C-alpha cells in the first residue's frame, strides 16, 4: 500500500485522508496480535494521538489490550527514574503544560487537569525510555482505604 516511507501518513487522520475513508469506516489491524481493531479502539487510537506503524507497507494500529500489555512491558524494561512535577519543570526548563506526558497505562496524552492532579496529590512522573509518563483520570487508581466498622 505505502512502499515509500516518505509518503506514509503516520497519524490516523492523515491516513484517512490518504485512503479517502472516514474514521468511522477505516479498518486497521493491531501490529501485535493482528486482530482488527474495534471501532471504539480506532477512535481511542485517534484521540490518544498514537502513530500508525507500517509492516511490509501496510498500516497498523494497536488494540487496547495489546497497548496496555506492551506499556507494562516497556515500564519494566525501560524505567529510568521518577520525579515530582516541580522537579520535572526545573529539569526540563518548561512548565508541565508544555510537556508531552502520556499515561503510563494507556498512553493517552495527559491534559492539564491530570498533570495538576499529580502536583496536588504529590504523585511522581516517570521517565520510561526517555519519555515522561503519569496517570490519566481513567487509569488513576485510588488509594485503598481501610474499612470502617
UniProtKB/Swiss-Prot annotation:
InterPro entries: E6, E6_sf. A motif (PDZ-binding domain) lies at residues 147-149. It is found in: Host cytoplasm; Host nucleus. GO terms for cellular component: host cell cytoplasm; host cell nucleus. It comes from the Viruses. It holds the Pfam family E6. Its main location: host cell. GO terms for biological process: DNA-templated transcription; regulation of DNA-templated transcription; symbiont-mediated perturbation of host apoptosis; symbiont-mediated perturbation of host ubiquitin-like protein modification; symbiont-mediated suppression of host cytoplasmic pattern recognition receptor signaling pathway via inhibition of IRF3 activity; symbiont-mediated suppression of host type I interferon-mediated signaling pathway. A zinc finger (unnamed) spans 30-66, 103-139. GO terms for molecular function: DNA binding; PDZ domain binding; zinc ion binding. Keywords: Activator, DNA-binding, Early protein, Host cytoplasm, Host nucleus, Host-virus interaction, Inhibition of host innate immune response by virus, Inhibition of host IRF3 by virus, Inhibition of host RLR pathway by virus, Metal-binding, Modulation of host cell apoptosis by virus, Oncogene, Transcription, Transcription regulation, Viral immunoevasion, Zinc, Zinc-finger. Belongs to the papillomaviridae E6 protein family. This protein may be involved in the oncogenic potential of this virus (associated with cancer of the uterine cervix). Plays a major role in the induction and maintenance of cellular transformation. Acts mainly as an oncoprotein by stimulating the destruction of many host cell key regulatory proteins. E6 associates with host UBE3A/E6-AP ubiquitin-protein ligase, and inactivates tumor suppressors TP53 and TP73 by targeting them to the 26S proteasome for degradation. In turn, DNA damage and chromosomal instabilities increase and lead to cell proliferation and cancer development. Belongs to the high risk human alphapapillomavirus family. The cancer-causing human papillomavirus E6 protein has a unique carboxy terminal PDZ domain containing substrate. Forms homodimers. Interacts with ubiquitin-protein ligase UBE3A/E6-AP and thus forms a complex with human TP53. Interacts with human NFX1 and MAGI3. Interacts with human IRF3; this interaction inhibits the establishment of antiviral state. Interacts with human TYK2; this interaction inhibits JAK-STAT activation by interferon alpha. Interacts with host DLG1; this interaction leads to the proteasomal degradation of DLG1. HAMAP family: HPV_E6. This is Protein E6.
Amino acid at each position: 500500500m505505502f512502499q515509500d516511507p516518505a509518503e506514509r501518513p503516520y497519524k490516523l487522520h492523515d491516513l484517512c485522508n490518504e485512503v479517502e475513508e472516514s474514521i468511522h469506516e477505516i479498518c486497521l489491524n493491531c501490529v501485535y496480535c493482528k486482530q482488527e481493531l474495534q471501532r471504539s479502539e480506532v477512535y481511542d487510537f485517534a484521540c490518544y494521538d498514537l502513530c500508525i506503524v507500517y509492516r511490509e507497507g501496510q498500516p497498523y494500529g494497536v488494540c487496547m489490550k495489546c497497548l496496555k500489555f506492551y506499556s507494562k512491558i516497556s515500564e519494566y524494561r525501560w524505567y529510568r527514574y521518577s520525579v515530582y512535577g516541580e522537579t520535572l519543570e526545573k529539569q526540563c526548563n518548561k512548565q508541565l503544560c508544555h510537556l508531552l506526558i502520556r499515561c503510563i497505562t494507556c498512553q493517552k496524552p495527559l491534559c492539564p487537569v491530570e498533570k495538576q492532579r499529580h502536583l496536588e496529590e504529590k504523585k511522581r512522573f516517570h521517565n520510561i525510555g526517555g519519555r515522561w509518563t503519569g496517570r490519566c483520570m481513567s487509569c488513576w487508581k485510588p488509594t485503598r482505604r481501610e474499612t470502617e466498622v
